[in-house]
């Protein structure tokens, strides 16, 4: 059975949109203006993005991710990749999508837009949100077309074991597409699921330049999969979807490998420092292991702390009262100045609630 049988039939049978006219001297086919008020190097911004520039960036990323150039397609950040995946495989009112909450809320958002079924396989905070194959098997149903792993997981910070991903790909080889969202993988001390692409045709990996690469403003990401899946995705990718300035700036940034290496190491070092400071703080009851640039903590003062930190200009992520993480905060690791300000603000909150004393449950 071909993995393409899991694609929506109406989309698989559709024709690719081919813009054409890329090499023409006079572009009289696309209704563009012949002038532009601004330019960007050699690029005339009055013209739609050049496919050649897109191919250059895809090749650059393919080399970095150690995959073949026909195994990657650019997206407008990871969100675009999630949206495309749900629309490509899920038929409204028929197919299902499995996720492992607490996780990135945009998965459920796009599944609802597609009017597909959402299968929830909850993680247990008592096990530090560790996922097992038994949990997946107990939740899976025959109409489950997509299984979504977030690794490292947002907001919990933990990795999904690569062996578990491989076993899931093998177990549901002809039944489900396995998607791994690796938005934070560069911060982890672990291999990427891209190393499994050659082995499993039902595996898709989503990557982004918004996190470790520091290019969130460019809105660039990619879908990585075996070539037949990438070719099929081209049927639903909007023409000219990636802006010329975004691609050009990304190409320039990716040439500076030393900057990325140093930045990631700095975040890891700062992460360890912040965790140590958190561990000394009596109002923080639990600190979860993290392979990301953020830290999830448990504190009974989560709501008060959110308001308190806002006075210092610090925004942190809290969670609704109905959430499993209602008494948790997700806090991003910043630069030295930001981290010190955070610790100082927490200390001032401690002074404000001085006299409180209770047992802590640290796992670090």
Curated annotation (Swiss-Prot):
Per the UniProt entry, the Enzyme Commission number(s) are 2.6.1.9
The family database entries (Pfam families) matched by this protein are listed as: Aminotran_1_2
Sorted alphabetically, which keywords does the UniProt record give? Amino-acid biosynthesis, Aminotransferase, Histidine biosynthesis, Pyridoxal phosphate, Transferase
Q: Sorted alphabetically, which Gene3D superfamilies does this protein's record hold?
A: Aspartate Aminotransferase, domain 1 (3.90.1150.10), Type I PLP-dependent aspartate aminotransferase-like (Major domain) (3.40.640.10)
Q: Name one GO biological process term.
A: L-histidine biosynthetic process
Listed GO MF terms: histidinol-phosphate transaminase activity; pyridoxal phosphate binding
The main enzyme category here is: transferase
Q: Which reaction does it catalyse?
A: L-histidinol phosphate + 2-oxoglutarate = 3-(imidazol-4-yl)-2-oxopropyl phosphate + L-glutamate
InterPro entries recorded: Aminotrans_II_pyridoxalP_BS, Aminotransferase_I/II_large, HisP_aminotrans, PyrdxlP-dep_Trfase, PyrdxlP-dep_Trfase_major, PyrdxlP-dep_Trfase_small
Cofactor(s) named in the record: pyridoxal 5'-phosphate
Where N6-(pyridoxal phosphate)lysine occurs, residue numbers?
211
Pathway assignment: Amino-acid biosynthesis; L-histidine biosynthesis; L-histidine from 5-phospho-alpha-D-ribose 1-diphosphate: step 7/9
Q: Say which family it is in.
A: Belongs to the class-II pyridoxal-phosphate-dependent aminotransferase family. Histidinol-phosphate aminotransferase subfamily.
Q: How does it assemble?
A: Homodimer.
Q: What is this protein called?
A: Histidinol-phosphate aminotransferase 1
Instruction: Record the organism.
Output: Legionella pneumophila (strain Paris)
What is the gene called? hisC1
């Amino acid at each position: 059975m071909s993995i393409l049988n899991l694609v929506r039939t109406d989309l698989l049978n559709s024709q690719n949109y081919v813009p054409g006219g890329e090499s023409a001297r006079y572009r009289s086919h696309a209704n563009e203006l012949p002038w532009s008020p601004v330019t960007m190097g050699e690029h005339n911004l009055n013209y739609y993005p050049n496919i050649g520039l897109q191919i250059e960036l895809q090749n650059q990323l393919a080399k970095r991710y150690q995959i073949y150039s026909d195994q990657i397609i650019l997206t407008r950040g990871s969100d675009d990749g999630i949206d495309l995946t749900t629309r490509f495989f899920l038929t409204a009112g028929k197919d299902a999508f499995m996720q492992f909450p607490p996780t990135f809320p945009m998965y459920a958002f796009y599944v609802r837009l597609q009017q597909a079924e959402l299968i929830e396989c909850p993680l247990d905070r008592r096990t530090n949100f560790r996922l097992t194959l038994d949990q997946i098997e107990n939740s899976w149903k025959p109409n489950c077309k997509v299984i979504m792993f977030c690794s490292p997981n947002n907001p919990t910070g933990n990795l999904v074991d690569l062996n578990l991903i491989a076993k899931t790909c093998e177990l549901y080889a002809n039944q489900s597409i396995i998607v791994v969202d690796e938005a934070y993988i560069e911060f982890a001390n672990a291999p990427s699921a891209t190393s499994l692409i050659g082995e499993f045709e039902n595996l898709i990996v989503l990557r982004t330049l918004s996190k470790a690469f520091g290019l969130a403003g460019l809105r660039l990401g990619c879908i990585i999969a075996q070539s037949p899946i990438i070719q099929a995705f081209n049927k639903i990718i909007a023409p000219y979807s990636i802006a010329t300035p975004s691609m050009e700036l990304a190409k320039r940034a990716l040439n500076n490998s030393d900057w990325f290496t140093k930045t990631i190491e700095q975040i890891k070092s700062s992460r360890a420092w912040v965790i140590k400071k958190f561990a000394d703080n009596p109002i923080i009851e639990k600190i979860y292991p993290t392979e990301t640039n953020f830290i999830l903590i448990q504190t009974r003062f989560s709501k008060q702390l959110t308001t308190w930190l806002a006075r210092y200009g610090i925004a942190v992520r809290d969670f609704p009262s109905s959430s499993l993480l209602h008494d948790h905060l997700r806090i991003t690791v910043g630069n030295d100045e930001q981290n010190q300000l955070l610790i100082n603000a927490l200390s001032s909150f401690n002074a404000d609630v001085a006299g409180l004393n209770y047992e802590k449950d640290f796992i670090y």
